Amino acid sequence: EYLDELDEKRPIASIHEIPAIDRFIFAMDSYIDMYVNHKALLQFNDNFNHFVSHAGTDSEMLNDFKSSLYSADARFLKMYEKAKEDHTFRTDIPFEEFMRETVHVMMAACTYYANGFIWGADENENYVSELKRIKGMIVAYVRNKEP
C-alpha cells in the first residue's frame, strides 16, 4: 500500500520528466517519511529480513515477496539509467553496488533509528534531523563522485 501511494505521487511513467537526482532524493525522503509515519513498516521489514535470513527459506518460498519488489526495483533501475543520460548523479559504479552504498544504507539507517538501535538514543526522541544529515551525506556522495 505504501508503494502504491508513492506511485500516485510519482508515477513510473514520469521517469523521463524528472531528473534522476530528483528521483533519488525522493527515494531518500521516502525512507525518512517511513521513519516519521510508518515506523512499524520499517520494523516489520527488519524482522522479516532477519527471519528469512535465519529460517532457511528456499528461493521458491520467496517468489511472491520478490515479485512484490518488482515495482521498486524497476524504478531504481530506471532512475540509474536516467542518470547515465542526464549525468545528475554518479554512474561510475555498478548499479547493484550503487544501491548497496546509497539506498540500502539510507533504509538501514532509518530502520535502526525506528527500532531505537542507535548509540546514545533517547526513547521517543525524534531523530529526523540526523536522518536528514545522513541523507545529505549520501546525496553529496552521489553528486560529487567522492569515495
What are these regions (language model features)?
Residues 1-5:
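Short, basic, alpha-helical segments at the C-terminal edge of helix-turn-helix-like DNA-binding modules
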Residues 6-7, 76:
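N-terminal alpha-helical segment
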Residues 11-41, 95-102, 131:
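Hydrophobic alpha-helical connector segments
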Residues 13-14, 49-56, 113-117:
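Secondary-structure edge/capping motif, primarily at the C-terminal ends of alpha-helices
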Residues 24, 62-65, 69, 99, ...:
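Hydrophobic packing residues in well-ordered alpha-helices of helical domains and bundles
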Residues 30-34, 74, 78-86, 100-147:
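C-terminal peripheral helix-coil segments that are non-catalytic and often amphipathic
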Residues 33-75, 96-97:
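Short secondary-structure transition hinges
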